[in-house]
Amino acid sequence: MNERRTLKKNSDFRRLYSRGKSAVNPYMVVYCRRNRTGENRLGYTVSTKLGGAVVRNRVRRRLREIYRLREPELRQGWDIVVVARMKCVKGEYKKMDASFFSACQALGLTKEAAE
């Protein structure tokens, strides 16, 4: 993922938490809000409550890969934050992928939802 397409600032995350739309499922919480760029910017939150550094990095890598594979199906021009929940630690990849996509559909981020 490109460096400029990643949310890094605390203010960006807080703006999404307070003013963005959200979708919740057992695996993750997805927040989104329109941005002024023509591309999506993505941020991940994986709490230390989920486990040590190895576990958190594994969850982060899985979430990044899920987004990378689903990106062609998503509309552009959004800030998206994915907050991992405890089920992500031992959850199956396919279920994580399905829950991410269903959250995106609920938020209207998919191209088919826009049509």
Language model: regions and residue ranges:
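Positively charged, solvent-exposed patches that mediate nucleic-acid binding
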Residues: M1-E115
